[in-house]
Amino acid sequence: MSTLRHVKKVLMISALLLLLTLSLGGGVASKSNDQAATYENLRLFTEVLSIIQSQYVDEVPPKDLVYSAIKGTLRGLDAHSSFLDPDMYREMGVETTGQFGGLGIEITLKDDILTVVTPIEGTPAFRAGILPGDRIVKIEGMSTKDMQLSDAVKRMRGKPGSKIVISIIRKGLNEPKDYSITRELIQVQSVKSGELEPGIEYIRLRQFQEKTGQDVDTALEKYNKGKKIQGLVLDLRNNPGGLLTSSVEVSEKFLESGKLVVYTEGRVRNQNMRFQASGKRTWSDFPIIVLVNQGSASASEIVAGALQDWGRAVVLGTQSFGKGSVQTIIPLSDGSGLRLTTAKYFTPKGRSIHGKGITPDIVVEMPKPAAGEQPPPPILDEQARLQDQLKRDPQLQRAVDLLKAMKIMDKTTRPAGPPSTPQVSVR
């Protein structure tokens, strides 16, 4: 019974702290009804946990009960909010530095189904043939129905060299398909670059990491030495996103000082933020084509949306993923944490792309691979690989043709002309 008393004590302290927080958040009189309802609900919550602790057929550790309750609460909020146990919380910092163990796959919950945003280029999932939009229905034979996002991530990670089987459903497949994938230490190089044709440069962003903005500058300076860049293809296809600040750093390299890149709105005042171009280093003297597809999400959509709204780039490809919310990682006292949606972001013209995505100015579909078609053998030389890709990639071909046409016409902005000044309403 000492364990039961401990659970009750912890829960009642939590309830009192929550009520105190609510009281300090505003006028007591105006919120008294809400506080009373909250207290009654917490009493019910405590009552249920106490019954489980005393009458459930098997003994359950108190922390497991509390963790399960927290997970259930967050699962009911939205697809991107989740509870992080101490192990998962420690791993959260790894992805932003560009190195972690697993399959190399970005996932989310879409319509309550575990869905692939994109496989990261060059990783085991990418080589295995996993595609954006694939629905993961089983992990190692376990159904993913009602599985929390953080739990799915944890199950797919593991020791490099170990194997895992995931089952996916895909449009065009009559039944689920099993993929056996060997885990690797995932090291993501966020920026790759090359020359498509003389004067037409190519920058591929795989993720938005801490040094992505700096790496973009390095690539541009490399190709601008001795010759002038006459056009740029910025490839954001299958880029699942990353750091908001990094997406702002990339966007502002192509916008005049003071131009709005993105703004966020949330319930808490400190979540209402505006990010403007600093003007530290602006590349404004050549046209840009931004490539997007279904695997372009979050930070990728911030960049595409900002450059599109200001008429700085033509967006080409297919509809992007549509993740327009901001998650904040909040540490908890026992080493665990919350990944909580705290705001939504908007493009300079006030567009929310959440659940909608960025619509390209020019839609170019990619041909679907034939059944049983194998990917081409890898080419180690980066420039040779890029030239080979250009032969097989209709979206990239169209981007180059468009830049060549702009070059002939001596244009440095979008063909449609300069946009009107965005009208932005921020609370």
PLM region descriptions:
Residues 337, 344-427:
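Conserved functional hotspot residues or short segments at active or partner-binding sites
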Residues 56-117, 161-180, 187-193, 246, ...:
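Extended, small/polar residue-biased N-terminal targeting/export presequences
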Residues 95-97, 157, 353:
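Short Gly/Pro-enriched turn/cap motifs at secondary-structure boundaries
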Residues 2-81, 114, 226, 389-398, ...:
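Terminal targeting/pro-maturation regions of precursor/exported proteins
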Residues 113, 199-200, 204-211, 365, ...:
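Well-structured core secondary-structure elements of compact alpha/beta domains
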Residues 2, 28-41, 45-62, 115-119, ...:
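Cleft-lining beta-strand/loop regions that shape enzyme active-site pockets
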Residues 83, 261, 275, 321, ...:
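Short clusters of hydrophobic/aromatic residues that line enzyme substrate/ligand-binding pockets
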